[in-house]
Amino acid sequence: MRALSLHRDHAVDAASGLAFDEAMAQLAGLPELPQAHLRLYDYADHAVLVGRYQRLEDEVDLAMAIALGVTVNRRPTGGGAILMGADQLGVALAVPAGTFPTPRQGMSRFAQGVIAALASLGVKAEMRGKNDIEVAGKKIAGVGFCTSGDGLLFHASILADLDTDLLLSLLRIPLAKLAAHGTGAVEDRITTLAELGAGRAELEAALVASFCSQLGLGVVDGEGRDCLERRASVLAEQRYSSEAWLFAQGAAAAGELAVEVRSSQGTLRIIAATQGDVIKSAVVAGDFNEVTPELRSLEEALRWSVLEPGALGRVLAAAPGVSGLAAPEELAAALCDAHFGRMALAGPRRIGSCYIPEEITL
């Protein structure tokens, strides 16, 4: 069915909310359902959602979340940790996988759809980096994507308003580092619809018009919802209510290296198991959007490599695509420094999250 089905939801819980989004992607393009699905919604106060490839323990103060009754879950899409609630507008668009030449090009088009909607309200926004939409240098939204089944899912979280004190209390990186400067340090880096004088209802209408125009589809209300809810109920129980999903990236075990470095695809956290001065295995986590061939090449190159800066640097330089992520000699030095105990975390540290534009500090 050549149509865009519009779904509106309010105060959803994290597990069912994420499951419905993924169900839209899995069923996008089925002949008996609309070709695309657009969902505009918000979460019950409050939920922290980490990105697909992040390590939960690095991003969220779990003890504080439990104390405050804040739900924690993991998105199917990449990117950084976000706080969702009544004051954050969630946008999910699901289309068949072949709609765009590549998923990354699809995310760019999706971001442009959000930017066009903001522009129709007189808000001039632009894309910055891999995930950020900014207004006058301040972040107003983050975007991400994933593939699921034969569909593509695009996520955006748009700030209608924000409780910066709550944000600071829940997110470990980088907000704990900014806490010494007070909430003003956060507020200087973000903006909201409320601050810009833009109405949420008007933006929702503009988003519908923008994506219908972009995809060349007419809108229908809630078509196929029963089918989506049946699929979502299974995903909510089997995936989004599972601790295995929540802690999917795992923590570094005793004796393993844990090194955080900046790369062209975002912040990478390399976790390596060693035997003597040799890396037995390595896993890369982080706020990237997808596991690319370059990231897989990095993991493969690290396996059974000797932790000596010169030798490891040469191995990484020879690995396909690794030099495009970060300087091989810097990666090698970071791992060797951590291994030999000179630094607990080596290399550039991230000052940034899903709602804080990234900076680099040495």
Where are these regions (language model features)?
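Active-site- and interface-proximal helix/loop "cap" or "latch" segments in soluble metabolic
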Residues: 190, 273-355, 360-362
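Beta-rich nucleic-acid/ligand-interaction surfaces
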Residues: 127-144, 225-236
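A conserved active-site cap/scaffold subdomain adjacent to cofactor or substrate pockets
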Residues: 182-222, 232-237
